Structure formats: structure tokens, C-alpha cells
Amino acid sequence: VLVVGASSGIGAALARAVAAGGGQVAVSARRSDRLEELVAQMGTGYAVPGDATDPDDARRVADHAATALGGLDLMVYVAGFGVLQPLVETDPDTWTDVFRVNVVGANLAAAAALDHLGPDGIAAFVSSRTVDDANPMFATYSATKAALDQCIRVWRHEHPDRRFVRIVMGNTAPTEFADHMRPERLGEALEAWQGLGIPGGMMDVDDVGRALAEALAVALDHPGIDSSEIRFDARPD
């Protein structure tokens, strides 16, 4: 298993769960120190630092992971980036930065992994419930995840001999996803979302990591069953 975006949050939790279940895992992200800490914590695995948005890095990461693991059954793209900003305030650089991580990186990682995935291999991508919710001040994130969803559909048509899984993810904590967001802007956004009836419940990140590892293991073990979409959300209060 190759987890791209494994330095923290859902990616790190997924890698820990895979390792705890006896799976072989390679972890990738830009922060090499975090990857080394994760591998030491797991007591197994391979750290393969790299920038998923760079084509050469994406290819090198997939090649090194496949060599270390003896092939790839599964690549999971968990890396994600979002900003809280009204559309009227969003400049071209912000749009470019969010698209680069959430769409370009995901597609480069899939393309790089494709040569190493067997006929029943899986490329899985963490998408978002916000695609359906249209959260105010979160348009760049939800728009890029919608673009990713469309790419997943096209991957399926272009490579029907492989499997491409969309993982619809609800709110998860604790992660570092919102660390760069201003607290007052986050509070404003949460209030707006609540007013629109958008669910605000949170899932525990380690619970999500374990559940995702289990769901993907089932998909790998049963290739004849359609597992094209996996959905996780917090139970309503």
C-alpha cells in the first residue's frame, strides 16, 4: 500500500492502521521528518519523501514504493489543501494552489502508480462531502474535489482494467487541515454552515483510519464486488 499525503491526519492514521493489520505500507509526503517519525512509530514501513504535484517526484515515489514493497496493490491519495475565503476575495494564486494539491497531485500520483498496479489494483482518492453541501467560504476546496470526482470517473473509462475508488469524507479531527485558517474566519464559516443545515459532526481521525483500512482491504479481497465509492460521515447527534 502506498499512502500519499501521510505526514499527518487521515493519511498517517490510515498508514498506522494498515501496518497494525499486518500490511506492507510506504508513506509519502513533502515533510521527510514526519515520515521518519511515522515509520518509527509503526515499527515497519518505508518513508518515500516527495512532492506529489511534481511529475518527476510523483513517478519517483511510485517507483521506489513499488520496489520496496514488491509491487503495489493499492495507492491512496489523501493529500489535501483548502482555504476559507469568500469567492469575491479569492485570487488566482489561491485557486492555483488549491487545484495543484487537490487535483493535479491526485492525477499525477494515479498516473505514476498505474504501471505498478495489477489488474485488480486500486487507486483511491479522498474526496469530500462538501462537493454536495456547497459550503460558503469553501468554494475552492469543494470545486477542486468536484473536479477530482470527475477525473475519477474518466480514469475508470480510460483504464477499465484497474479500479478507481472515490472516498467521500466528512469532518474529521484532530488533523492539521485547519491549522492555517484564522480562528475568527473559521467560526464565521461554521456559523454559516450551521445556518444552512450543513452537518457539523466530527469523526475521530484514528477511527477513520481504521475504518478506511478495513474498507479498502475488503475491496482488495473482493474484486468482483463494486466498491467504487466509500463514504464516511459522523453519525447525527
Could you describe each region identified by the protein language model?
Residues 42-56:
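Rossmann-fold cofactor-recognition segment
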